[in-house]
């Protein structure tokens, strides 16, 4: 194997690691892995969302219907793109930095909601 072939192979093997390191989520997002993100509406009903380290998420709607999609980090916001049921676009919100207090946000209709992180995989 020539020196240039070895260097090319090393670069190809290292590239995915560099991309993964560059896109590592912040600590407040990592804290959601294995736990439940609640989006609480003014009427008290909530959606449950579970972020996974691989960039996907699953959840339950206010009515208990299955939700799923992909998530990404853009600046200080977490963006959810929903594929089940399919919705166009994505919703980006500031993610709670203090799980016990949560953060106020706006839903797509402009209604004020509260985002809160709850320990464990809460389903009810």
Role assignments for model-derived ranges:
Residues 1-8:
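Bacterial N-terminal signal peptides that target proteins for export
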Residues 6, 17-124:
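Lipid interaction determinants
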Residues 12-13:
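Hydrophobic alpha-helical transmembrane segments of integral membrane proteins
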């Amino acid at each position: 194997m020539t020196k240039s072939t070895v260097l090319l192979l090393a670069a190809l093997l290292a590239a995915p690691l560099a991309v993964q390191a560059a896109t590592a989520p912040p600590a407040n997002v990592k804290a959601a892995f294995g736990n439940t993100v609640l989006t609480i509406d003014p009427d008290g009903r909530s959606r449950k969302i579970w972020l996974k380290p691989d960039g996907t998420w699953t959840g339950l709607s206010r009515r208990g219907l299955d939700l799923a999609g992909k998530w990404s980090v853009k600046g200080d916001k977490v963006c959810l793109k929903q594929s089940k049921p399919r919705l166009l676009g994505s919703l980006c919100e500031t993610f709670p930095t203090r799980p016990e207090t949560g953060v106020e946000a706006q839903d797509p209709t402009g209604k004020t909601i509260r985002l809160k992180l709850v320990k464990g995989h809460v389903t009810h």
